[in-house]
Amino acid sequence: MKTELNLHGRSLTLHRFPKRSNETLQAWDAGDEYLINHVEEMALPDHQNIVVINDNFGALACWFSEKHHVTFMSDSFVSHKGAQKNLEDNQCNKVAFLTTMDSIPANTDLVLVQLPKSNRHLVWILSQLRKILPTACPVIAVNKAKEIHTSTLKLFEKYLGETKTSLAWKKHRLVFSQANAEPRIEVDPITAWDVEGEHIQLKNLPNVYSGESLDLGARFMLQHIPQDASINHIIDLGCGNGVLSVKAGQLNPNVRLTCVDESFMALESAKQNLLDNLGEGRDIQCVANNCLDGFKPDSCDLIMCNPPFHQQHAITDHIAWQMFCDAKQILNQNGKLLVIGNRHLGYDAKLKRLFGDKNVKLIASNNKFVILQATKNPAKLSAKQ
């Protein structure tokens, strides 16, 4: 796996985050290279104010910080940590870090965007750029050519302004735009709806997974969250908008709830949804993190988990494996990990490898999903029992 980015006589050493010894995925892609090549050809004067949005692991921030003032904007905690580590390893100049809910800096000279997977997130970003940027400020976005549709360009034209595209290079294409769309459209960051069949209302910020309706996996999982007075602490790992935590809190009014996600927008949404649906005075914590890094071992009774199988645009199962390994460390003895996943992902084999064959059981299944329960080191029953 390549870790050296070599362009224009310069070299950067770049790693994904967290760094793994058997890593098979690069920390940058051809889209990053296309952006770098194009901006270098622009021959900008030094000390420009460049905003970089959705820079997966900091390749763009590292490159442009040598001569310019860079602001890194991302909704991803993992991207923030990856960029910070790569900046440090390459001894780069200081970069400002913001989330995509923060305001775009007003004195921006150039905006570079790796297009997000979510159209809601894209519309939010475009609307914020239109609100702040002067017309003369170039906005250059990149993605795989097959992911840039006519509908994508129409969103640019509607929410940002005049838009055109480049020729394809290494299966990627650039999108050129500027902030001149009229009229300027205000975008509400919150999408709210009721969960059918539940006493739950959810508010979703733009980059929340399945933010416009409840995904089928979560709907199935809601039916199998336990009600158990012996449970003191529940962790919702990869919490999204917090719907599973809300249900767990309704069923277990005295439980301590910890929501963990790598999306800052997901955590803000979960925090608001828990407050709205459970009220004040509950023992609730929302944590931006890479899985369960830094959590105290043997400190939790139940972990609920719906693992993602993407990291940015890459398909990977290493996040699920890290979640399962972390969960085993954090669970108390006899603590339980409740996992939902698509049937084809084979989580049962992974969990049995980690927890032991006899400690993993099927809780429920339908034609698309399975819910599995893994128990940590079940205590042996005494002879009297």
From Swiss-Prot:
Protein keywords: Cytoplasm, Methyltransferase, rRNA processing, S-adenosyl-L-methionine, Transferase
Keyword Transferase: yes
Compartment annotation: Cytoplasm
Principal localisation: cytoplasm
Pfam family name, one: MTS
Catalytic activity, reaction form: guanosine(1835) in 23S rRNA + S-adenosyl-L-methionine = N(2)-methylguanosine(1835) in 23S rRNA + S-adenosyl-L-homocysteine + H(+)
Name by which UniProt lists this protein: Ribosomal RNA large subunit methyltransferase G
Gene that this polypeptide is encoded by: rlmG
